[in-house]
């Protein structure tokens, strides 16, 4: 398995170009199954999960090509099962189910894998499809969905806010007969992006970005060209990298209005931030950040995917900061690893209390999930000495060429090929 060797400490400064959002690209790739004509998707990041999704679409019979943009022609899809060998590495494959049952009347997806943070059950996807008229069976480790004729529009009140299930229901409802209303829908920018992609293909969707999405079913979806929005979590990660190293950064191809909660906390930490239409700059003027209190919650509140990075920020900040995680349980696995580097933190229930220290020390640490692993790499950039980050396949699932981008900012980082 590959590792990163990081030599610190360095002050990170310079420019970085933000990639397309993984969490929008994946649902959009699967939503392309709904279209009877070819679609072109631009600004798709080069990531392991994207490659797996494209392979899965090919196995279902879609024509998939990548030459800068990703081109998908799902007109000849003739296989309706997403097999275990592809699904086991990636939770997003559940998003094949809604489009398959909506367009072809049948679909089956092996129960998914992916990051091991907390209970992320597929039950909300299943109840949503059932309310649209699908029959669902769980057999031999597969979720099997079928419907006679078309799905039927329904008024669906979601038990809890779920990005994944909102995507599934919204995609399936685009081809249902009649109107579907999703109450308590997720409001994330990636939901808005997926909806806007579907609208480009001829879907009738209103209210995306609010907690009430209305979808009027149409008979078919056609062709279109769509550009995936910039990755707000990658943007936030690089902003934190500059903040903790007392540096300065310019993020290009960013979308500032998707990051309001994160930018507010960085300003609280003492960062000087400016934004333009598609860029964000941060300058610490050589100062150490100040500790901040953070509570994660669904969008537009502070994103859980930025929690590990802000835990790290607090651990090297002036003062004591509290980080409370309300979205996933079991999402502090990076804290014991950071403690190996000298960090001072206590976990009490769903809160980590961070006591800021001046400098961390290099150590051998292990990545446990995607965002936690990014925080360990950033810790290595600012720690005294050498840090080895193990199990970095987690990072490759969500960050495009993170070592190249960090190197361009002055980091001393190399990928060590595993056996």
Swiss-Prot record:
Pathway: Cell wall biogenesis; peptidoglycan biosynthesis
InterPro entries in alphabetical order: Enolpyruvate_Tfrase_dom, Enolpyruvate_Tfrase_sf, MurA_subfamily, RNA3'P_cycl/enolpyr_Trfase_a/b, UDP_GlcNAc_COvinyl_MurA
Catalytic EC class: transferase
Keywords: Cell cycle, Cell division, Cell shape, Cell wall biogenesis/degradation, Cytoplasm, Peptidoglycan synthesis, Pyruvate, Transferase
Subcellular location: Cytoplasm
Record has Cytoplasm as a keyword: yes
GO molecular function terms noted in the UniProt entry: UDP-N-acetylglucosamine 1-carboxyvinyltransferase activity
Listed EC numbers: 2.5.1.7
GO biological process: cell division; cell wall organization; peptidoglycan biosynthetic process; regulation of cell shape; UDP-N-acetylgalactosamine biosynthetic process
CDD domains: UdpNAET (cd01555)
This protein's record includes keyword rRNA processing: no
Function noted in UniProt: Cell wall formation. Adds enolpyruvyl to UDP-N-acetylglucosamine.
Protein family (similarity comment): Belongs to the EPSP synthase family. MurA subfamily.
Protein name: UDP-N-acetylglucosamine 1-carboxyvinyltransferase
Organism annotation: Salmonella gallinarum (strain 287/91 / NCTC 13346)
Gene name of the record: murA
């Amino acid at each position: 398995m590959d590792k990163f060797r990081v030599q610190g400490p360095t002050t990170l400064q310079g420019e970085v170009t933000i990639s397309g959002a993984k969490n929008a690209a994946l649902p959009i790739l699967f939503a392309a199954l709904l279209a009877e004509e070819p679609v072109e998707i631009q600004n798709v990041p080069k990531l392991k999960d994207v490659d797996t999704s494209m392979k899965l679409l090919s196995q279902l019979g879609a024509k998939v090509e990548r030459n800068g943009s990703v081109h998908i022609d799902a007109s000849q899809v003739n296989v309706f099962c997403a097999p275990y060998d592809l699904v086991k590495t990636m939770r997003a494959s559940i998003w094949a189910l809604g489009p398959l049952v909506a367009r072809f009347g049948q679909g089956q997806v092996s129960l998914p894998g992916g990051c091991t943070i907390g209970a992320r059950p597929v039950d909300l996807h299943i109840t949503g499809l059932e309310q649209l008229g699908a029959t669902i069976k769980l057999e031999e480790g597969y979720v099997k969905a079928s419907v006679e004729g078309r799905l039927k529009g329904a008024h669906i009140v979601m038990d809890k806010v779920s990005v994944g299930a909102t995507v599934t229901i919204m995609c399936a409802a685009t081809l249902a007969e009649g109107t579907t209303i999703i109450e308590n829908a997720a409001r994330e920018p990636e939901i808005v992006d997926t909806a806007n992609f579907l609208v480009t293909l001829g879907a009738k969707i209103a209210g995306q970005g609010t907690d009430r999405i209305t979808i009027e079913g149409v008979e078919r979806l056609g062709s279109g060209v769509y550009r995936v929005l910039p990755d707000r979590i990658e943007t936030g990660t690089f902003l934190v990298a500059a903040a903790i190293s007392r540096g300065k950064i310019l993020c290009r191809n960013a979308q500032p209005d998707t990051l309001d909660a994160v930018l507010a906390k960085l300003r609280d930490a003492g960062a000087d931030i400016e934004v333009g239409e598609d860029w964000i700059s941060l300058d610490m003027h050589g100062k150490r950040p100040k500790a901040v209190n953070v509570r994660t919650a669904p969008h537009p509140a502070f994103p859980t995917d930025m929690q590990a990075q802000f835990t790290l920020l607090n651990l090297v900040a002036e003062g004591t900061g509290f980080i409370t995680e309300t979205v996933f349980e079991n999402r502090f696995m990076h804290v014991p690893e950071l403690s190996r580097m000298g960090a001072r933190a206590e976990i009490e229930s769903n809160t980590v209390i961070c006591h800021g220290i001046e400098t961390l020390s290099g150590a051998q640490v292990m990545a446990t999930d995607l965002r936690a692993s990014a925080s360990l790499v950033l810790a290595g950039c600012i720690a005294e000495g050498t840090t080895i980050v193990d199990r970095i396949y987690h990072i490759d699932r969500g960050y495009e060429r993170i070592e190249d981008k960090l190197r361009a900012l002055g980091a001393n980082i190399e990928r060590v090929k595993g056996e």
